A protein has these predicted regions:
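Sec-dependent bacterial lipoprotein signal peptides
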Residues: 1-26
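Leucine-rich amphipathic alpha-helices with coiled-coil/heptad-repeat character
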Residues: 84, 91, 132, 136-139, ...
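A cross-kingdom marker for long, charged
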Residues: 191-236
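Amphipathic alpha-helical coiled-coil segments
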Residues: 70-73, 77-80, 118, 125, ...
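Leu/Val/Ala/Ile-rich N-terminal alpha-helices, chiefly Sec-type signal peptides and the beginnings
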Residues: 26-108
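Register-specific recognition of a single heptad position within extended alpha-helical repeats
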Residues: 57, 64, 98, 105, ...
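Extended amphipathic alpha-helical interaction segments
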Residues: 100, 108-200
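Extended, non-membrane alpha-helical segments enriched in charged/polar residues
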Residues: 68, 75, 176, 180-183, ...
């Protein structure tokens, strides 16, 4: 009986030690994962340029639960890249293709399609920003991680969102005006003649209407270019 009690008393502290070692091992693992994630944010995400990298299987294992934190950044970044590539770069390409008056007609359908999609694009980006902000606000991060993550969040989410906000309205106004010019030229049919990279109308009234339509284009083009440049810089 005495021997049994002795073993019982001896076994209890051993179990306690094992529990302490086990728990401390868990805490160390979480700390290592957080440290690896912080290093990734500072040395990769902050220097990634236009596109955030997709996490590898090894990185997901290294970061553990912080993979979901990164998903907030990566998800919004993907939305912005899609908006720039599919929604706004086609506008830039069509605008750059307009070199002579005939090009207003050849580019009006691509520009009309782009203009029609810009409103939907603006709503999608707004929803993506709201979701990212909500997920960011719900995070409970350690003191060493939070300032680093917030810095990357500003670079990846806040700054691009602020830059895109004026770009889409500028693109809508500019593309709509370009389409109107192309439609007007097309409506004149064979009355219009193109000479030496210029355009001629049979009446002064037609010429005046054309000049009134192209009048706002210079300032609209400038506003769009400035907003586009700001957005490109913000996503790099």
């Amino acid at each position: 009986m005495a021997t049994g009690k002795s073993c019982s008393r001896w076994f209890a502290p051993v179990v306690a030690l094992l529990m302490v070692f086990s728990l401390s091992g868990c805490f160390d693992k979480e700390g290592d994962q957080r440290k690896a994630f912080i290093d990734f944010l500072q040395n990769t995400a902050m220097r990634s340029g236009e596109r955030l990298p997709t996490l590898t299987a090894d990185q997901k294992k290294q970061f553990g639960p912080f993979v979901s934190d990164y998903a907030i950044l990566y998800g919004y970044s993907q939305q912005v890249n899609q908006a720039m590539d599919s929604g706004l770069r086609p506008v830039v390409d069509s605008v750059n293709a307009i070199r002579v008056p005939q090009d207003y007609m050849t580019q009006r359908e691509p520009l009309r399609q782009a203009n029609g999609s810009l409103g939907v694009l603006a709503q999608q980006l707004q929803n993506a920003k709201l979701q990212a902000d909500a997920a960011h606000g719900a995070l409970k991060q350690a003191d060493d991680l939070k300032p680093v993550f917030d810095q990357v969040y500003k670079k990846v989410v806040t700054v691009p969102a602020d830059a895109l906000q004026p770009l889409i309205p500028a693109a809508q106004i500019f593309t709509q005006q370009l389409v109107q010019v192309g439609d007007y030229i097309a409506q004149q049919g064979e009355q219009v003649s193109f000479v030496a990279n210029g355009i001629q109308f049979p009446t002064s009234q037609q010429a005046s209407q054309y000049n009134a339509l192209i009048g706002p284009l210079a300032s609209q083009h400038q506003a769009f270019n400035q907003a586009w440049t700001a957005a490109v810089n913000a996503t790099q």
